[in-house]
Amino acid sequence: MTANNAMLTKETISQIAHRLHQAEQSREQIRQISLDHPQITIEDAYAIQRQWVDLKINEGRVLKGHKIGLTSKAMQASSQISEPDYGALLDDMFFQDGSDIPIDKFIVPRIEV
């Protein structure tokens, strides 16, 4: 077991963060991470997120805030977790009111209401 009770190695966490980063840049969907790493933990997922955010910040993005997701019990159940999750919001994730949102910026766009 690695630090922070994570089941994935630091190298694997870094590789996954880079895969996600490349997928965003190429706009190509990748295979669900948990299918390749069924032992992944919540701690691993947050470690991957931190590495991915670091990659973005190193490219010039700016951390603007945080978000909470999966706040409903139904969404938590569908994701097989028992608590809300959280994530970082970077400057390139915001759009001005009334502006057009470039659909080609996203791989599989969805709207959460």
Language-model-detected regions and their locations in the chain:
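Active-site microenvironments in enzyme catalytic cores
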Residues: 8-113
